[in-house]
Amino acid sequence: MNGTEGPNFYVPMSNATGVVRSPFEYPQYYLAEPWAFSILAAYMFFLIITGFPINFLTLYVTIEHKKLRTPLNYILLNLAVADLFMVFGGFTTTMYTSMHGYFVFGETGCNLEGYFATLGGEISLWSLVVLAIERWVVVCKPISNFRFGENHAIMGLTLTWVMANACAMPPLFGWSRYIPEGLQCSCGIDYYTLKPEVNNESFVIYMFLVHFTIPLTIISFCYGRLVCAVKEAAAQQQESETTQRAEREVTRMVVIMVISFLVCWIPYASVAWYIFTHQGSTFGPIFMTVPSFFAKSSSIYNPMIYICMNKQFRNCMITTLFCGKNPFEGEEEGSTTKTEASAVSSVSPA
């Protein structure tokens, strides 16, 4: 084995020289220079000071403006809640441990940090699944006269939390485990060992199949059908120009969210799967650290996309920030008229 396995950790470095120590007890400066840990801490600080205000603002603006409380926006707000879980439950912990060079909070802290990070990522993924299904149903209309309402949104929210916890909670109760990864300052699922005592192999396969492959398959199917439907509608002019434009804008926003999610998480998932399927292979701590910390950036892109591409929300956010006034109102009125994204979910067949 090219790493060192302990009772509750796996350090990607051979202990032939005897320098490897538990990441719960000693600084891991033999894995990288201290400045590398400082960079990680600074990066996490950046994610905290950007991720918290932008996600909190998304929630606050929606609560402040009643017209934003639409079924589709429930799902988008769910993404903001998931991101806040990651910020408070994961990023603050990782920043502090990176400053010390090892996971100072012990096994319990590792479990909590791993749980919140996994929960946030899975809520985001399953929220995108619900959004993809909503887009497919609204645009492709497999069910005539269907309108995505509040009850459907609540069912979608329930699905995201049930499925996310079905992935994040088992390691807390003995099916797999959370251990420090990369530079040993953040925690995640144990992809590094088979660990038969906790049936680790079966959990990793379950997670990749049920909580990664299946969601991506559903998303791919929905958007494959959606692209065809949009082209057909444009060719046949079955909908009014305003309706088609609104549907295209919401669809474009959700597609960009999906692409951004894949850009952030595919590298991490690919590296994790490689490590799992190549047990004992040689890899350095940076090999897992970079994609792991890059995936954490997903906490800031969803609200950014939402703010940039949803004119109605953007206007409400500006009026909130400027105490009820919109200094850019003249520019907004002079721009091309766009139908608000949040209203599209209630578009009925023509």
From Swiss-Prot:
Alphabetical UniProt keywords: Chromophore, Disulfide bond, G-protein coupled receptor, Glycoprotein, Membrane, Phosphoprotein, Photoreceptor protein, Receptor, Retinal protein, Sensory transduction, Transducer, Transmembrane, Transmembrane helix, Vision
GO biological process: phototransduction; visual perception
Functional description taken from the UniProt entry: Visual pigments are the light-absorbing molecules that mediate vision. They consist of an apoprotein, opsin, covalently linked to cis-retinal.
InterPro entries in UniProt: GPCR_opsins, GPCR_Rhodpsn, GPCR_Rhodpsn_7TM, Opsin, Retinal_BS, Rhodopsin, Rhodopsin_N
Tissue: Rod shaped photoreceptor cells which mediates vision in dim light.
Extracellular side: 1-36, 99-113, 177-202, 277-284
Free-text description of this protein's post-translational modifications in UniProt: Phosphorylated on some or all of the serine and threonine residues present in the C-terminal region.
Identification of the protein by name: Blue-sensitive opsin
Membrane association type: Multi-pass membrane protein
Disulfide links within the chain: C110-C187
SUPFAM superfamilies (alphabetical): Family A G protein-coupled receptor-like
Annotated Pfam families: 7tm_1 (PF00001), Rhodopsin_N (PF10413)
Region Disordered, annotated ranges: 330-350
Residues annotated as glycosylated: N2, N15, N200
